[in-house]
């Protein structure tokens, strides 16, 4: 809930390339599932149209908000090759660049928390990520993602102290007391135009 509210704060629009070329490989970045397109549809305006106020090879989007939960595996954090189209699909964290990537229910993925945390050490420290092509090459890409881990496990169950120090902000969100819950409920009901029985 907090991450979604943070995402809904009005922010500047961002531009992303539809595709990225690296070492002769094509990476498909724009994903309509995660990227809310705000410019004209590509079929309506050509890349050379004078009406366009920016380079037509870029797409204007709202900052992305991407969530993955228990289904997350390490291969989802690397390039995915499609042999039919001979094109790579960008991983979730690259699609989340300039936005928020929430790993929800952290510690309950198909891989251990240590493996997931180890995957993020370099990107969190250097603000770059390295992705692997099936031919053996690597692509260095920017890592400008606000990464959020959400968990109901204790921090010591998730990783060692050295890694937890790398996470700049930590927030404990406790369950509200009964009186706090009643107040929250009343406020929400009023905001929706509903009456609340005092009993």
List each model region and its residues.
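Short acidic (Asp/Glu) and glycine-rich catalytic loops that position anionic groups and cofactors
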Residues: 97-101, 162-167, 180-185, 199
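Switch/connector loops and helix/strand junctions flanking conserved nucleotide-binding motifs
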Residues: 4, 14-15, 110-111, 155-160, ...
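Conserved C-terminal "switch" segment of AAA+ ATPases
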Residues: 156, 173-199
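Short, contiguous acidic/charged loop-to-helix segments that flank catalytic cores in large enzymes
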Residues: 108-111, 137-138, 170-176, 192
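A short helix-turn-beta junction within AAA+ P-loop NTPase domains corresponding to the substrate/partner-engaging
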Residues: 119, 159-175
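Conserved H-loop
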Residues: 152
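Short, surface-exposed helix-loop/turn micro-motifs enriched in polar/charged residues
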Residues: 112, 139, 159, 196-197
């Amino acid at each position: 809930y907090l991450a979604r509210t943070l995402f809904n704060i009005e922010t500047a629009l961002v531009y992303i390339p539809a595709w990225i070329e690296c070492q002769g490989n094509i990476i498909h970045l724009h994903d309509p599932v995660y990227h809310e397109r705000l410019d004209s549809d590509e079929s309506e305006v050509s890349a050379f149209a004078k009406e366009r106020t920016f380079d037509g090879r870029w797409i204007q989007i709202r900052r992305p908000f991407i969530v993955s939960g228990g289904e997350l595996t390490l291969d989802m954090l690397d390039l995915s090759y499609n042999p039919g189209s001979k094109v790579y699909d960008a991983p979730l964290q690259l699609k989340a660049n300039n936005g928020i990537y929430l790993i929800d229910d952290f510690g309950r993925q198909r891989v251990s928390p240590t493996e997931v945390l180890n995957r993020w050490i370099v990107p969190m420290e250097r603000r770059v990520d390295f992705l692997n092509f099936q031919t053996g090459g690597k692509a260095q890409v920017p890592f400008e993602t606000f990464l959020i881990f959400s968990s109901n496990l204790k921090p010591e169950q998730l990783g060692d102290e050295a890694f937890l120090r790398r996470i700049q902000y930590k927030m404990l969100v406790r369950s509200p007391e009964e009186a706090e819950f009643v107040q929250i409920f009343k406020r929400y009901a009023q905001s929706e135009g509903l009456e609340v029985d005092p009993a």
